[in-house]
């Protein structure tokens, strides 16, 4: 990713209530494990770090995510899989405990605009627009009726 070259201050803030609702919708049926909130470095554009929260601490995770996302140029996201308790700082697929559903990132130019033709027969449970400049980017989520044990 390229370094951030946008404004250094903004007049709006992330919506913590929407973040809480999205985390609760996605992880609400998961009873154990942890949620990873990650964020990018506005200087390099690369992943800076992760902070882990109990899978039921939606408010705390959203408060943290909103605070991090309020810094211009610093993107925040969550890992859509529940991480096994006691996992090391940097995880791999083997550290996933549950997956509440399937998801995809539409981060390439033009992908979000074409998505409707791709999912016309199977609408996603939720869509998050992750950016609009220089082009629209989105994440699509299809939630299962219950979480699936990772690797099964």
Regions found by a protein language model. Name each.
Residues 88-92, 138, 142, 151-152:
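A short acidic (Asp/Glu
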